[in-house]
Amino acid sequence: MSESSLPSWHGTTILCLRKDGRVVIAGDGQVSLGATVIKGNARKVRKVGGGSILVGFAGATADAFTLLERLEAKLEKHPGQLTRACVELAKDWRTDRYLRRLEAMMAVADKDVSLVLTGQGDVLEPEDGIIGIGSGGNYALAAARALIDIDGLDAETIARKAMAIAAGICVYTNGNMIVESL
């Protein structure tokens, strides 16, 4: 079987949103290889930086952990400066031959800012404070945008509802959610 005909790893829907001074990152638990579910309870959302930063990652697992380790190192070097740490990581990502081949994306957030780190080494801040990445990211993003202005729904409720909608549409997303908030 040639490398290009090998089944690819799929999975992960990560959603980050802000509402009423709260920030939430939610991730599903499914990892698939081709049409097979390999794991249903993977943890793709974490707190780092002493619990002050939320991270959700999508893409190849080993690559995502490599980037997470690099981000943690940048945060140690630039404590309390999430944007600067992400920009420094992006610089490395663009210039390091090894990192350039990593296939992963991350959504990161602290109390002030939410950012996407793309597979091309970009750092993007969404204009509406809502991020959706991974196989079901666009579904979760659309659902969160539809729910965000509804009175009585807090950030975690919106995240859970949006992720449930994504899980109902995307075959690479399940309903086993991990939610972290600040």
From Swiss-Prot:
One of its GO terms (molecular function) is metal ion binding. The keyword Protease applies. Its EC number is 3.4.25.2. Its main location: cytoplasm. It is an enzyme of class 3 (hydrolase). It comes from the Bacteria. Coiled coil: none annotated. SUPFAM superfamilies: N-terminal nucleophile aminohydrolases (Ntn hydrolases). A double ring-shaped homohexamer of HslV is capped on each side by a ring-shaped HslU homohexamer. The assembly of the HslU/HslV complex is dependent on binding of ATP. GO terms for cellular component: HslUV protease complex; proteasome core complex. Allosterically activated by HslU binding. It is found in: Cytoplasm. This is ATP-dependent protease subunit HslV. It holds the Pfam family Proteasome. The active site is at T12. Keywords: Allosteric enzyme, Cytoplasm, Hydrolase, Metal-binding, Protease, Sodium, Threonine protease. The lineage of its organism: Bacteria, Pseudomonadati, Pseudomonadota, Alphaproteobacteria, Rhodospirillales. Na(+) binds at A167, C170, T173. It comes from Paramagnetospirillum magneticum (strain ATCC 700264 / AMB-1) (Magnetospirillum magneticum). Protease subunit of a proteasome-like degradation complex believed to be a general protein degrading machinery. It catalyses: ATP-dependent cleavage of peptide bonds with broad specificity. Belongs to the peptidase T1B family. HslV subfamily. One of its GO terms (biological process) is proteolysis involved in protein catabolic process. HAMAP family: HslV.
